[in-house]
Curated annotation (Swiss-Prot):
Pfam families reported for this sequence: Alpha-amylase, Alpha-amylase_N, Malt_amylase_C
Name by which UniProt lists this protein: Maltogenic alpha-amylase
UniProt site positions, description: Transition state stabilizer: 424
InterPro entries attached to this UniProt entry: Glyco_hydro_13_cat_dom, Glyco_hydro_13_lg-like_dom, Glyco_hydro_b, Glycoside_hydrolase_SF, Ig-like_fold, Malt_amylase-like_C, O16G_dom_2
Keywords assigned: Calcium, Carbohydrate metabolism, Glycosidase, Hydrolase, Metal-binding
Cofactor section: Ca(2+)
Active site per UniProt: 328, 357
Amino acid sequence: MFREAIYHRPKDNYAYACANGELHIRIRTKKDDMKEVTLVYGDTYEFDDNKWTYSTAHMKKTGSDQLFDYWLASVTPRYKRLRYGFIVNDRKDSTCFTEKGFYPEPPVNDISYYFSFPYVNQADIFQAPEWVKDTVWYQIFPERFANGNKDNDPDGTLPWGSREPEIDNFFGGDLEGVIEHIDYLKELGIGGIYFTPIFKAHSNHKYDTIDYMEIDPQFGTKETLKKLIDVCHKNGIKVMLDAVFNHSGVFFPPFQDVVEKGKNSKYQDWFHIREFPLVMEPRPNYDTFGFTSSMPKFKTENPEVKEYLLEVGRYWVREFDIDGWRLDVANEVSHAFWREFRREVKAIKPDLYILGEIWHDSLPWLRGDQFDAVMNYPLSTNIVNLFANQSVSVKEFVENMSHVIHMYPDTVNEAAFNLVGSHDTPRILTQCGEDVERLKQVFVLLLTFIGTPCIYYGDEIGLTGGQDPGCRKCMEWNPDQQNRELLQHVRKLIQLRSENPLLANEGELTFVPPKNEEDPCLAYTKSNEEKTIMIIINKSKNSVEYPLSFDAAEQTVKNLWNQEQLILQNGQTLELKANDFKILEF
């Protein structure tokens, strides 16, 4: 027994409360070390004859990464408090693991040995907006989606799609163009639109904000935005805007005041300026996003800055009824600011979705007091490595994703913003070597996984493009130039997800362990007490026979993709043709 690999902490992703009153308790052990793990638990104050009374619960192995196994038990404490430990059994030995170490038997004379969940306080439970779990998002880069009003085109606007995207060219995309294509999004099955910034700025991407309180004139007016949001809401589509509170653009008036007046500017303490006069090149002598001199970093601990940015957050929720904020470079802004931001905007709209752009382990932001979710780039990376780069095996993918899933509580994973492409990454079809069959498999995984999936505009019709700015092509609206088969594939997957809650966030996800390093089939189940849906993806260019395992000797199975009914025997193999997939319900 490798005791040094056994780990638990009584908080965060290892011990957390759910809205239904359940406590989820996890423990980590060395991979393949334990035969079984049992949870020992009881109320903090219940004793019988001066001995603590406890119950036991079998813990289920919920996944394995390259080094560890993860185990879970769910209990509902009668009095909303719990003391607990673990009995670990490696086939040769059994021992009780507690907060104070290892013991041959569960200690009953002193509960201070045990881990403690002192009380389930409702205010401490992580709860993302319920509607998010059923939402399929669509990311729109407004300058490249559709030109609905040529009167607001900036000078030098190019004919739509006439050239490759460049860092500084414009094609006239605007909010009116989105309004004109709401029917397209509704037919696709989209439930939410994530817009990259629409506030006044000089660039085509608008991340260099000049005025946080104004719509960029090339996109329209505030009235246009109100019309857009109204049309979206009438069609069951949520709207999420993108804000940059880490830094402003260089032409943001307060920063321009500092440029002009130096240390005499009343705004000089709005930014992290190390010395005067300001130096912009080769490296600025003030803090910025990266070393980009045109993006000076806000000092959010300054009360004036904090109030200005908080009012930005409040204003667009209060006056325009937006449904979410996506927060750029969120990890470089203080936790204190985000806690206050959450309180302020949720006071106006409690079910507002707050999404942070963070590329690494994000648990410190996901404790229920800051964000509802972060952009799930670890999932993106693993999907790209499996299907596009083909640099990891199915076994490695399962291990990597098991690690990611167990980094967070299940309640966090359900609201994770899952994506395979964005304005910051090469087009997913390009990364797949323009192999549409591989891209279809990517969409199968994206749209049947836990979390809330997002499609980058045009990926559903096969747009291609390299790294930024190549990934920001104009949307193709000519049906003859769209990959209609791919579009229908994505539509059908979204419809299946909508019709089958298990394909979204109901139930439990479990990976089926690959047979070996060469196994080309990725398989996982989504299950509840009533039924199971199994997704099998053959990423090989050859047909394979996939062995099926059921609890019963014979099982009636429905293929949800083609509605075919099958009667299969336990242990029977199922043929998957090259690049094929199955979505089986039983």
